[in-house]
Amino acid sequence: MFDSSLITYAVSLHFSQKVNDIVISTLQAIADETGNRFMIENKIPPHITIGAFHAAREEAAKLLQLVEDFARDQKAGSVQFSEVGDFNGKVLFLQPEKNLFLSKINNELHTLLLPEFEKAENGYYLPDIWFPHTTLATRLNQSQFSAAEEIAKKISLPLEAPIEELAVYQ
């Protein structure tokens, strides 16, 4: 059972400005066409979440320090977005190839943090079941989905996305 005194922390990868510009212009076009402004209004930056963990408030500094040290030790990497995908016609995303860089960073993060902190998000980011993606639109109805998908298909794929930063969100 979930302990409501715990805080959820998401660890995410961020892209180069060039890739961000492509994704953000797509988010904006989808919002303008469909009226679904969730991604824009919530100021969600383009990212790939590589882990989500619960921590008590008094353990936050420890988690943040572990992630900061982990980020410092990472080698440069990139992902290649190869297709547009969806979750049940409700979420539209860019799907990267699950390459060695992504698999390794996801696995190593969990190896480091799971002994200390509880998994969050029903374990969706655990290495064996993780499905890396960058959300373009979420909470779509059927007509919004069709319009959003047409816009997303205009992104020139494959798209090479250098990773510029590893960040933590609450």
Predicted regions and their residues:
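Basic, often amphipathic N-terminal segments
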Residues: 1-78, 101-160
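Short hydrophobic/aromatic beta-strand or adjacent loop that forms the aromatic wall/cage
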Residues: 10, 91, 165
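Short hydrophobic/aromatic-rich beta-strand segments that constitute the beta-sheet cores
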Residues: 50, 93-94, 136, 168
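Short, surface-exposed loop motifs enriched in S/T, G, D/E and P with embedded aromatic residues
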Residues: 80-82
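Glycine-rich beta-strand-turn "strand-cap" elements at beta-sheet edges
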Residues: 84-87, 164-170
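Acidic/polar active-site rim loop that often engages polyanionic ligands
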Residues: 87-90, 129-130
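Short, low-order "capping/linker" segments at domain edges
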Residues: 90-100
